[in-house]
Amino acid sequence: MGARHGVPWLTSYLGEKIMRTASLTVLALVAAFLFSVLPAQAAMDHGSGAAHYSDRAFLSGMIAHHEGAVDMAKVFLATPKKDQDPQVTAWADDVIKVQEKEIAEMKELLKPLGGIEESAYAPMKKAMQHMLEEGKNLGANMRFVELMLPHHAMALEMSVPALLGSNNPQILNLAENIIISQAKEMRQFKAWIAEHHKK
């Protein structure tokens, strides 16, 4: 079944460019994300917000967002090794490896655009600092996973306008990679949380 028949509302919402170029996997993930994570009205608001999209603002905000994830991972990895769940440790290691690499890539992409846009970077940096203060009543493993779940959801929400508004193939590829990898990890996080709440 083609993308138009599988998710018919996406043609008008995502636009012809994305329907022509994005993979079925990405379209399915975006559709599932918009329906399951964002409130219905918020999902529709992305359509009107696409006109105000800029690559510079997206990259600047995502750098701060990624830095927040790296900070959370480092806080977790600073806990005693004996208290770390091996799966959570692997996730934290992967967050640092992948997101530090993407931070470097985004900084390179920003160079011809004028560098970091503080009006996009600073609010996200502040939001990440607030998030880092949350969940202190939880154990280290549960805290990291519980924080990563909304953190990843925010990354998906930030990436949708990039798919809608960017004309830069590298940024489109970055946004697609974020959606695919972090949606997959969100499913894993939810399964881990459900399993460990049973114990």
What positions do the PLM features span?
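Bacterial N-terminal signal peptides
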Residues: 26-37
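Helix-centric, low-specificity signal for extended rod-like, repetitive segments
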Residues: 13, 32-34, 92
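Short, Lys/Arg-enriched N-terminal segments with co-localized hydrophobic residues
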Residues: 3-18
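Sec/Tat signal peptide C-region and signal peptidase I cleavage site
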Residues: 18, 38-42
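Bacterial N-terminal signal peptides that target proteins for export
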Residues: 17-27
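All-alpha RGS (Regulator of G-protein Signaling) helical domain and cognate RGS-like helical scaffolds
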Residues: 42-199
